[in-house]
C-alpha cells in the first residue's frame, strides 16, 4: 500500500506542473464571464471529465500510436523534452496573459453570441490542461514504468487511473472555486506560481532530452 501512495505522489508531482490548474482557472475566468453559476459548474465538470479521458487514452493507447508510426522511446523523450521545455520557457517569460490568448479571444467572441458555448474541451481540457507536453510526458512515463521493476505489477495497474482521477478532481475543484482562488492568490500570485512551475518544466524538459540522448548513445555504443 505504501508503494501505491509513493507512485501516486510521484505521478502528481510530475503531472501537476504540466497540467497547471491555476493557469486554467485564469483562462476559465476570462471565458466564462457571461455564464451563470450553473453553466460554469457544468463546464467545470465536463472539462475535468475530458482531462481524465485524454490522460487515460494517452497512457493506454500511446504505445500503440508509437508502434504504428515507428516512434522510438529515445525519440519520444527528446521530442517530449523539447515540448515541455518550450512550455516552461513560455511560462517563465510569458508574452501574453491567458485571457488574451487567441483561444480566449475567439471563445469570448463566440460567447457574446452564444452564452452556452462549450469551452470544456477546447481550450480548458486541451490544450490548457492536457496539452502536448502532458500527453508526451504520460506516454513516455508509461513506457518507462512498464520496463522498470520499481513498483509491483498491481501498483502499475491501479496507480495511473487514480493519478489521472486526482488530477481531474483537482482541476474540477480549482474551476469550481475559481473566483475564490483569484481573490485569495490574486493575479500576481498566479503569475508567480506559473513562473515557478515553468522553471520546473524547463528542468524536467532538459532532463528528458538528456535521458533520450543517453539512451541513443547506449543503443549505438
Curated annotation (Swiss-Prot):
Keyword Cell cycle listed: no
Keywords recorded for this protein, A-Z: Cell inner membrane, Cell membrane, Membrane, Transmembrane, Transmembrane helix
Side Cytoplasmic, residues: 29-44, 90-118, 176-196
Primary location group: membrane
InterPro entries: Multi_antbiot-R_MarC
Record topology, Periplasmic segments: 1-7, 66-68, 140-154, 218-221
Record flagged with keyword Protein biosynthesis: no
Subcellular location: Cell inner membrane
Transmembrane intervals: 8-28, 45-65, 69-89, 119-139, 155-175, 197-217
A Pfam family annotated for this UniProt entry: MarC
Chain segments annotated as coiled-coil in the UniProt record: none
Membrane topology classification: Multi-pass membrane protein
Top-level taxon: Bacteria
Gene Ontology CC annotations of this record: plasma membrane
Family from the record: Belongs to the UPF0056 (MarC) family.
Protein name: UPF0056 inner membrane protein MarC
